[in-house]
Amino acid sequence: MKPVALVTTKPGFEPQLREELNKLPIKKKILWTPFRGILKVLSQNPYEFLNIIKENKNNLKFSLRIIPLEIGCQTDINEIKKAISFLINKKKEKLKNKSFVVRCNRRGNHEFTSEELERIIGEYVLENFKDLNLRVNLKDWDFKINIEILQDESYISIFQDEFNELVIEENIKNLKNLKRYIERPLNRSERKMQELMEKFPFIFENINCVVDIGSSPGGWAKMLSKKAKKVYAIDTGELKIKANNIIHIKKRAENVDFEKDINEEIDLITNDTNLYPDESLFLTLKFAKHLKTNGYIIHTLKARNLKTKKEDLEKVLKILSYYRNIKIFKIINLRANTKNELTLILKKV
């Protein structure tokens, strides 16, 4: 299977969107993305998937835009040009003497803007496909070169006639007016913890004291408070959640005085902070000396970038090798992790 579509929803309703997409009568796999309100669909081909969407449109309540994907590449201007050339050559008989527009939806941080890329690609197509007698028309075009960028990944399609993105206006209207849930849907951070609880339920059994490092805005603390008698949420930032058993230590983790601020044996340590890998690990290890024997640590390794992920993991593992009573139980790539993240489950022996 390959990426065949991006499907958008109102941010916060990704779990509901995933559930309804999973019910579609087609072989597929639904993936989370690092971007709120966007899921990626893997299947056999985008044309078949789009037809299935149209046939089952009335059963979809959380799908807003369905964007078919024909070809993927790295987010590099030259790679994008190659992918577009491939598609144009494949469809050139249908594109002769037509007008076109280039549209880019860019998500993430890049050295170029969406508008700059649209201009670069437009000029490239005109220069390299003169034999097709193409012309640019920003409003009344015959086909659209559509570029969807998700940080390091880019997806290109040529929309024409019936093959086009599908916008479900009724759902946009309904979701806009939808009353908020009494308890809001899970965000990506909470989905990570939910997945951990489902995969490793024994870690969360009979726990009294949890220390959650870098807790703000409180997603992990909220979920842990339902399993533990007490959660110490360590962060200078505000918590967006409240529970009688959540104790907010409003300090930087490195400034916490354990005897004064906690002073009890820890059953579980969690850390999902946005810090450099080694810096974050040393904070976890600071509290590990107060972790009970056979207690677990859940630590998110956040690499500096995708290219340094292996190097950052090796650095963290080297640091851990000096702590003989802290053993690696599992290194896992959760569905809700970003591409730069790995989840380390450690155990004190």
Curated annotation (Swiss-Prot):
SS bonds (residue pairs): none
A single cellular component GO annotation: cytosol
GO biological process: methylation; thiazole biosynthetic process; tRNA 4-thiouridine biosynthesis
Classification via PROSITE patterns: THUMP
An MF annotation (GO) of this entry: methyltransferase activity
Domain THUMP residue range list: 51-160
PANTHER family xrefs: TRNA SULFURTRANSFERASE
Protein name according to UniProt: Uncharacterized protein MJ1257
Upper taxonomic lineage: Archaea, Methanobacteriati, Methanobacteriota, Methanomada group, Methanococci
